[in-house]
Amino acid sequence: MKLKKSFLNHCKKKNLEINPNQLELVDHLNKFYNLNFNKSFLKKIFYNKNTKPGFYLQGAVGVGKTMILNFFYENFKFSKQRIHFNEFMISFHNFKFKNKKNKKENIIEQFVKKLKKNYELIYFDEFQVTNIVDAMILGNLFKKIFNENIKVLFSSNIKINDLYKDGLQRDQFLPFIKILKDKCFQEKLIIEEDYRKSQSDKNKRFFYPLDSTTNFKVNKFYRQITK
């Protein structure tokens, strides 16, 4: 997947500002794709013990994390599902209710096998855990999901260690946190401004230090004053 080139073209067509931190994230997503889906790449490395089936992106509101993960998702050509986490858990509980009489196999295993049959990638946008019922089963559920080698994208405002913080019986939730940390590449997107509430840099007199971020701001400033 030549994600970076496609992303640059996408930003150019949409007249979107390109931030170096966002470009770095695109590179990490491209690596995630190559490690998990690029067969020619996999043949070259044969086996990479650093390969992980999950990608957890944390960042504040408005930094563009959803835009970038959505772009990755739209360019992903295999079977996939984008779903809100609460909706996903409702689908699990509905499945559990409908299949409660089936004692031949564990309900979680049945549910995950169904996922495996339909999807190679699942994308949870704005992931968070607030429900104690969900919190208590996530460890077993995602252990099965990752064991089936289903790839998972997470977008969240919350870092992994702070998920379900101060929640009831949180000690029983901690195995899920360990699973996420073991099975996911962890990235944090840091942007100084909220693109949905961006303010002009016209009042700035100088930019420092001289790095890629500063270069981005100077280019943005130039575009603003030459409109």
Predicted regions and their residues:
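Conserved lysine of the Walker
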Residues: 65
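Walker A (P-loop) phosphate-binding loop of P-loop NTPases
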Residues: 62
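Conserved P-loop NTPase "ATPase switch" module shared by AAA+ and STAND
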Residues: 115-132
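N-terminal pre-Walker A segment at the start of P-loop NTPase domains
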Residues: 15-46
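AAA+/P-loop NTPase substrate/partner-engagement loops
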Residues: 75-106, 110, 114
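Pre-Walker A (Motif I) flank of P-loop NTPase domains
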Residues: 48-57, 120
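Hydrophobic positions on the alpha1 helix immediately C-terminal to the Walker A/P-loop
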Residues: 68, 72
